[in-house]
């Protein structure tokens, strides 16, 4: 056989089975597969076997470096489900992983916070859950780093809790607050998950529901420990501090108690949790911390995880122990070796190499068997722990029942004979406990042969026995104290005997269960002893194989050299890592220095901002003071015009004076609002300056026109008007002085000017001339004609709508027919309501005329009240015109040639016109008139029918129009951002267009009022009105009513018939 010398190191380093690099690569591969299978985008819960492999990997490498190296590369911002499952896996790693995992996760706090903030700003259901979950994880990491006495699993004894709390009341107080915050984060996550689930169906059996519910198992485990610790700490605080100081703690605990109890109750009702976890039940009410003895009644909630069922596929080993060559790479290495050195003589491999490989396989097989035996032992130990925990819970429940019985016995102090019988029964139970203690001590002796983990089980069991002995001692002391009772009431003997029998039955049942558990414990101990024997045999076989391997160590010097070379490379790599860590620490120091500098700059910027803010306040007040000074000059100039001889030839009308005075009063209200806004925000005086400018001009204009009006008025009213104008100017100047003083500005009294302005307004009303009696022969006829024409137009509109409804039934079907019928029915109802309104208004007008005309005729009454008559005519025309326009719009909508918005606008116009008609009728009506009450009811009916038209139109429009659903599934983050910006641009354009159209609508309305005020007389309007006689042909439209041209008379509107004209300033 040819011997090969000086084998290249690169060939030796690729031989599987002994290289540390190959073992590390296999470990990394296993972890990568487990992480990719556990954290994916499928909406399903994380499988337990993948999470368990990741947790075992943290124990293998004593940290979470590998986990975070793969987790950083996951595309968490792209999928909310991926982020949710990452948080779930991280929670399990924190709870069950190696203790160093906590410090490794501390380095990636910023990554966790960024993921939570990212999904918190997006409207995604899983995203909102991820935001809450990341806050919980950050709180958990901070708490356990601050309190290293508490492991991430939160499972500590009461002694460790006492040691962590210490004796300082401040530390206990702070620790309790931190545990409250911890519990709030846990409960908030559970509430967020349940809020997204539909409890009406079995969501816990669906993969989507289980994906959300799976992390709540860890939440239940955390909450049970946190609840127990907070109860202990609160009792300790109440023993040191007064109750009033801890009122806030008690309120917060009660709120958390009810939330936790509802959480446990809802989780217990779900099928998903019943097979995975045993959830404890909390008592009906929270503990009473004001009573120190209530601590003995507290029972620690115990969460039990049932034994996991065996999985179908075998778990993957952390170290490759396969007997066959790896796929791909070993074949390539063998071919390269043969091509370089040639095949060996007679065989492919050397006999020694084959023997070495067979021995390696045997060693690996024995090692795997040893690992299996260890895993089985750990599984047995976990099962025994769960049984002991269940037994502990049952014993606690039994102790509580005994305490309740003792409380009843204390209340019934007269049961001496029965208590002695109970004492004998207690001695019998004590004998049973002593026998159980002897058996437990024997079990402890057998378990001392196992590892240190078995001693922990024996310690827990002995602690339980000691608690039982203490309970028996307490029972004996209580019974001895009961012997002092002198009298016994025979009436309660039956009740005590019944309590005794129940306690005996329960005690016997618990003793039988305890004996059964002892027997099972002994059986498990025997199985563990047999496993120990098999382990010893395996170790002997391993020693024999080791001796055989030692004989072949001389031939493995070359391999040892290669290993030493690899170790040297590893040391070099470690030195490189240390250098990298040193550079990283320097970078962190530099970052901290830069942070300090930035904080200094921030403080400087804040001081500059404060100075600029003060400067802005000064500048705003300077602008306000300048505006007030300018306004004072304008008012002073207006007051001086009252004594100016050149102003004597200037005249004005009372109507114009009234309009200017009313505008000035409105400007006073605006000035008060601007003053209030300025006091709220001293940095913005724009509203106050604008209001001040407008007020000064309007007040000056009112003063000037008041003087001009007094030139044509009688002497006495003219003198009073001049005096009022001077008083208004003086009060306005006083107000301007207050605005210029920074101290008096806050107490400005705008009411100083309102009183003289109201006086000017009242004098202007008194100076108005009375209306002239014009067209005595025409006004009455015009009113009757307009009311008759309006009724006829409404009748035609009702008939036309019925014709359109018949045509729509023949021309359309389906959804369109349903929409058209609904719209036309609502229009018909509206027309009927308007017809009833017009009829009632006519009756009310007749009543007004008959009650108010006296000895005069009807024509004379209308002529005497010409303004009221013109308003009535205008309102009647507006109703008729609105009804006609509504019919036209409905016809266009049914024929699909019009817009739904036209119908809505016509409905609003009809409502406004009927309101105008009602207002015109109510002016001279008696408030107790039955016709007026019916008119008001009809007006409300018209408004309701108009609202029905609008509602049916909008619903029909939404029913017919197709609505495109927004689909964002194929859009990336960049595309979404681009479309968001484009949509914002479109929104701004539409808002600008909307503002322009609103301004145009305002100008049209202004022009409409101007034209309405400047139109001809009512007699002329009647002359140009077309005939409103109904037509017999149903296919033709009813006559089109003319839009009213006589607008309701306002105080500031003028009419040439009044004989008064606006003021004209003439200079001679």
From Swiss-Prot:
Tissue: Brain, heart, kidney, pancreas, and liver, but not in lung or placenta.
GO annotation, biological process: actin filament organization; clathrin coat assembly; digestive system development; endocytosis; intrinsic apoptotic signaling pathway; negative regulation of actin filament polymerization; negative regulation of apoptotic process; negative regulation of Arp2/3 complex-mediated actin nucleation
Feature: compositional bias, Basic and acidic residues: 425-443, 539-549, 1049-1059
Annotated region (Important for actin binding), positions in chain: 867-924
InterPro entries noted in UniProt: ANTH_dom (IPR011417), ENTH (IPR013809), ENTH_VHS (IPR008942), HIP1_clath-bd (IPR032422), I/LWEQ_dom_sf (IPR035964), ILWEQ_dom (IPR002558), Sla2_fam (IPR030224)
Residue intervals of the ENTH domain: 23-151
Any one cellular-component term (Gene Ontology): dendritic spine
Localization (cell): Cytoplasm, Perinuclear region; Endomembrane system; Cytoplasmic vesicle, Clathrin-coated vesicle membrane
Disulfide bonds, paired cysteine numbers: none
Biased composition (Low complexity): 590-600
Coiled coil: 347-599
Gene3D superfamilies from the UniProt entry: 1.20.5.1700, 1.25.40.90, 6.10.250.920, I/LWEQ domain
Function statement: Component of clathrin-coated pits and vesicles, that may link the endocytic machinery to the actin cytoskeleton. Binds 3-phosphoinositides (via ENTH domain). May act through the ENTH domain to promote cell survival by stabilizing receptor tyrosine kinases following ligand-induced endocytosis.
PANTHER family per UniProt: HUNTINGTIN INTERACTING PROTEIN 1 (PTHR10407), HUNTINGTIN-INTERACTING PROTEIN 1-RELATED PROTEIN (PTHR10407:SF10)
Protein name: Huntingtin-interacting protein 1-related protein
Gene label: HIP1R
